[in-house]
């Protein structure tokens, strides 16, 4: 097993109190890695954190250097002074700074939900180039009711008396991840909890919910315009792309997933049975699909 190591990148940030902040990232670097100059960069979903990718990283580490980011306000990364900056443009700039720090000869991207949006923005804009892209249950069109569902819980800041209480809360909240063993739920949940003076809290800044404040009941013109921008970014992506979709996902519709196979990157679609939003990339069959795609010589 390759033990992940925690690293920090200091970012100069004039908008942050103190003028700088720390961006945390984890690395799985196998001593006998076949291609350490090829980095697989994995970026998590809205309320998640980098260690979500541990199982996938273990499978890839003998072949690639694997890095996963704690996006600003999550995990071990600093919280932002201004909650309005919890948005994709900030995350894109941060991730680009990390890529420049890592200096990979080749880059592959794995993005779950929000992490996929960041990847589309980076690659579609030409700010970064990748050998291969994996989009996990995300696309240019996101279902509005699902966004409202997510917005309803993301700003909460519960405190749990025990770790077990926190883990039970997360297992219920993320039931759409599909069936997992108790050990798998524990591995997915423990990094999500932080000790406090009176119990345990979730790892992220509750202010990441800023983008959901005042969200209208139905899609407005601003949301429609943002959707068109995302499609334009997706259409500009040229690298081989694998699209995973949970068969029961309420965020990525079957119609959007099919459209993504016909335009832009012309993604290869893999549907994960008995899973909603989003596949965890923990189950062996999910890991195998992603690993085989990223290691395939046909993803030049």
Model regions: which residues?
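Alpha/beta-hydrolase fold catalytic core
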Residues: 1-40, 63-64, 285, 291-300
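Catalytic histidine-centered segment of alpha/beta-hydrolase-like enzymes
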Residues: 275-284
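Conserved HGGG/HGGXW glycine-rich cap/lid loop of the alpha/beta-hydrolase fold
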Residues: 27-76
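Conserved serine/cysteine hydrolase catalytic core
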Residues: 194-259
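Conserved alpha/beta-hydrolase catalytic His-Asp/Glu region
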Residues: 161-216
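Catalytic histidine neighborhood in serine/cysteine hydrolases
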Residues: 263-274
């Amino acid at each position: 097993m390759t033990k992940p190591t925690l690293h920090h990148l200091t970012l100069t940030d004039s908008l942050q109190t103190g003028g700088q902040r720390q961006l945390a990232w984890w690395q799985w670097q196998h001593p006998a890695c076949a291609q350490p100059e090829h980095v697989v960069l994995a970026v998590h979903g809205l309320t998640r954190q980098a260690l979500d990718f541990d199982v996938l990283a273990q499978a890839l580490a003998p072949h690639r250097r694997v890095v996963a980011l704690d996006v600003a306000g999550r995990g071990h990364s600093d919280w932002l002074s201004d909650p309005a900056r919890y948005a994709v443009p900030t995350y894109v700039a941060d991730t680009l700074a990390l890529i420049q720090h890592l200096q990979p000869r080749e880059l592959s991207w794995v993005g779950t939900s929000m992490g996929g949006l960041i990847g589309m923005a980076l690659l579609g804009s030409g700010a970064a180039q990748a050998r291969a892209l994996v989009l996990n249950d995300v696309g240019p069109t996101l279902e509005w009711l699902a966004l409202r569902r997510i917005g309803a819980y993301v700003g909460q800041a519960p405190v749990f008396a025990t770790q077990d209480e926190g883990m039970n809360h997360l297992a219920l909240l993320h039931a759409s991840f599909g069936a997992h063993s108790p050990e798998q739920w524990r591995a997915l949940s423990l990094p999500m909890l932080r000790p406090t003076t009176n119990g345990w809290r979730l790892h992220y800044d509750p202010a990441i919910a800023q983008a959901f404040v005042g969200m209208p009941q139905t899609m407005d013109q601003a949301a429609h315009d943002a959707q068109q921008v995302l499609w334009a970014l997706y259409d500009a992506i040229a690298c081989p792309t694998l699209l995973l979709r949970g068969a029961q996902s309420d965020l990525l519709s079957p119609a959007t997933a099919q459209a993504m196979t016909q335009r832009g990157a012309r993604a290869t679609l893999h549907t994960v049975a008995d899973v909603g939003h989003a596949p965890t990339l923990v189950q062996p069959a999910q890991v195998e699909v992603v690993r085989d795609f990223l290691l395939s010589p046909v993803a030049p």
